[in-house]
Amino acid sequence: MVITASSLSGIDTFVDALWLEEGLSKNTLTAYRRDLTLYATWLAGQNRELNQTTALDLQLYFSERHAATKATTANRRLTVFKRYFRWALREGVVQEDPTLTLQSAKQALRVPKTLT
């Protein structure tokens, strides 16, 4: 599916804002752009745009795409979405934040292999 110009514009504006306001590294900005673009592509397959996202859309996306993904990866992507929608709400691009009801995936505690 093809991402709409509106969705691409929203992603570009958000990433630019992060760079200007927070000075995030190029790698971080690239990862944010990739995660949002993958989600926007999935949304295009549902005939929806990024700024039309509902909590149900995000739940479906995570259940379809992250069943076999590590919790750390799913949580990183959730953080990207939370930051995007918090920004979009502040900028008046969306009326509500669909990430408010979503919870992070549970991660197993890591025990060190050896203690020295």
Give the residues covered by each predicted segment.
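Conserved segment of winged-helix/HTH DNA-binding domains
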Residues: T116
